């Protein structure tokens, strides 16, 4: 087994390999001064692309640093020597692999073939040269420039061929003519030359004509530049007319295409709408058939609950027909409520305030009743405004009414509490029935009725419970027996307020009658 190369040998080899122009840039991204290498492909990479290769795995690309790593083997160095960026670029381009994605590029068939090729060439070079520093493809003498040889290989595959400076140099073209001139000048000294006597004059003419034909394009170009300056050509009016006609034709064609597309879209939309309407008609017919099979009550319930389309068919319309306005009828409940409000307003018409002297009581189209109806609104307002000014002593504002009501309630509660204290002063325990007098009153009434009926031979339920007293008129009914004390006070207060309102209404009616008919 061959010994490992020393660090000096590794640096010498990579210094010479990095001096090649194609190896001065990254193989993947083209970054300058790459310091990493892929032994699997024999190419030089930058640090970013080396990370990408390392993520691919060692089975696809084995990465090492050309400056930091010192444990290179001779097989790895031979792979780098037989490889190179230029050879890899040419091989991938030859096999049609031009992908930029690293995963796609290095998992392709071309990459697999190139890996195998580099491995075979490196093994062959190691077997042949052993531990020699250079191989046959590289010059062992440092005086010879290896860059020139590698640059020729690079220009052959990646760049356009360079021009021959010797062919384009005018001094070079004139140098060979000098010996011919000198030889022609030296011919008289040697004697007359008869070699040209056998030449045909037509050949010389043909030669001159070919030379003139070659120079004619240059002369024409010079004349064109002298006349037109920048080589512009005059455009005739006919060309403008032709261009304008073509533009008009293109515009018409574009408009026609747009109209056709719009028409086609409308037709498709109408067709889809017609199809949807037909489907709705079919569904409605199915629902009608289902409802016809039902009995009378079930059918009415289905129509009322909206379980079919029959009840909605009266207000449905076709999407292809014109829209029709559907007016909603006024419901009967609104009329009834309005009539109740009008009846309430009619009551307020009697409370008309001061008359309007601008109005004529005998104007056309007005009657006595309609006149009062028209004045109902402001008459009610006047009632509300004049209500505090009524002279009747029983009418009070709302605040005073509530205060008086509260006073009555407090008085009644105070009386009840004092009576309860006196009544149950010596009792040890009382119940709610005893406190409110329910139990005592019922027992007392029952005992009194039994005493009254003790001497009678026969009694009835009406006599026992006292139901017929009010019917025969034998007993007297008072508000005290019907309503409690607090309710009696409220009832009296309500009667007083109603009486006051009636007085106001009567006063308003009398004032309006006097104002209207008093002068007649």
Curated annotation (Swiss-Prot):
Transmembrane regions: none
Residues the record lists as Phosphoserine modifications: 140, 145, 200, 236, 239, 311, 333, 339, 363, 431-432, 512
A molecular-function term among this protein's GO annotations: GTPase activator activity
GO annotation, cellular component aspect: cytosol; Golgi membrane; plasma membrane
Coiled coil regions, renumbered to chain: 241-307
Membrane-topology annotation of the record: Peripheral membrane protein
Name of the protein in question: ADP-ribosylation factor GTPase-activating protein 2
Chain's gene name: Arfgap2
